[in-house]
């Protein structure tokens, strides 16, 4: 696998050899000094060019970055509408294990790009000194955010409201219905509550990473193993056990956050647990 230095040099040389490539920015985790580097991090680049169609019309230039195994063009897909409403992107996997994303952006959209940026940007090439402001990579947009009392209430309300759907799905033997609500709504609210608990104890000036991937660093082994146990969903019995554990964990962490944040505690669980017990457990 090529090194980071080799990839950055390759991309920079590409820009300097082409008059219509004016600026290249590196984005994402490779700009974030708060994340430990490893060789599997993606390379996310923004190429600011004078003519996007020049590059999209004939795409042999992509092979200059290595031997391609797979490519996706989000702006050229029908089933999955692209997130970006300006520019054109390539998601590429290379034979040596490198994953590289290149987004072509018209030079006229430079200010819009910085306005929309998440802060994790580093300028690699600026041939004409067009970037006038100082650009320093910053991950503060992803830091934990202290909840308002209303946000705390809303999280509790959503969790207990959706818990009834999981219980009903298991009772009806509609496992995919139950799992969808469990995985996509219920557990994310548990993770949100745990993240607030961590924030109140450790501060709100850092990130837990995408999909809470660093959350284990801020929990005890016992706490993290209990969280992992909510993912054991092999069949109805196991799913319901995990669901009940999820509810117990949510009660534990929401009570902690209520105390730490000096919030009134909305005692939703008593009525909802009675509702579930009376309707889906008899």
Swiss-Prot record:
GO MF: transferase activity
Its EC number(s): 2.7.7.-
UniProt keyword terms in alphabetical order: Antibiotic resistance, Plasmid, Transferase
Transferase listed as a keyword: yes
Biological processes per GO annotation: response to antibiotic
Catalytic activity: streptomycin + ATP = 6-O-adenylylstreptomycin + diphosphate
SUPFAM superfamilies for this protein: Nucleotidyltransferase, PAP/OAS1 substrate-binding domain
Xref: NCBIfam families: ANT_6, ANT_6_str
Described function: Required for streptomycin resistance. Adenylates streptomycin on the O-6 residue.
Protein name per its UniProtKB record: Aminoglycoside 6-adenylyltransferase
Species: Staphylococcus aureus
């Amino acid at each position: 696998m090529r090194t980071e230095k080799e990839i950055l040099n390759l991309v920079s040389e590409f820009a300097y050899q082409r008059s219509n490539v004016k600026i290249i920015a590196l984005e994402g985790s490779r700009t974030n000094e708060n994340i430990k580097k490893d060789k599997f991090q993606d390379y996310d680049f923004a190429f600011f060019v004078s003519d996007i169609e020049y590059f999209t019309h004939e795409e042999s230039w992509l092979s200059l970055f290595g031997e391609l195994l797979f490519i996706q063009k989000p702006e050229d897909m029908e089933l999955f509408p692209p997130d970006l409403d300006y520019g054109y992107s390539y998601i590429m996997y290379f034979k040596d294990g490198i994953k590289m994303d290149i987004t072509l952006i018209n030079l006229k959209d430079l200010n819009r790009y910085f306005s929309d940026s998440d802060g994790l940007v580093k300028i690699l090439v600026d041939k004409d000194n067009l970037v006038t402001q100082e650009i320093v990579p910053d991950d503060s947009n992803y830091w934990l955010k202290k909840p308002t009392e209303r946000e705390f209430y809303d999280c509790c309300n959503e969790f207990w409201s959706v818990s009834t759907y999981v219980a009903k799905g298991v009772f009806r033997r509609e496992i995919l219905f139950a799992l969808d609500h469990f995985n996509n709504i219920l557990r994310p609210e548990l993770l949100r509550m745990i993240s607030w608990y961590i924030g109140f104890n450790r501060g709100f000036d850092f990130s837990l990473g995408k999909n809470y991937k660093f959350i284990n660093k801020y929990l005890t082994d016992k706490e993290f193993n209990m969280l992992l146990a909510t993912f054991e969903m092999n069949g109805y019995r196991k799913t319901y056990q995990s669901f009940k554990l999820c509810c117990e964990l949510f009660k534990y962490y929401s009570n902690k956050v209520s105390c730490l944040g000096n919030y009134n505690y909305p005692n939703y669980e008593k009525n909802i647990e009675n509702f579930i017990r009376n309707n889906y457990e008899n």
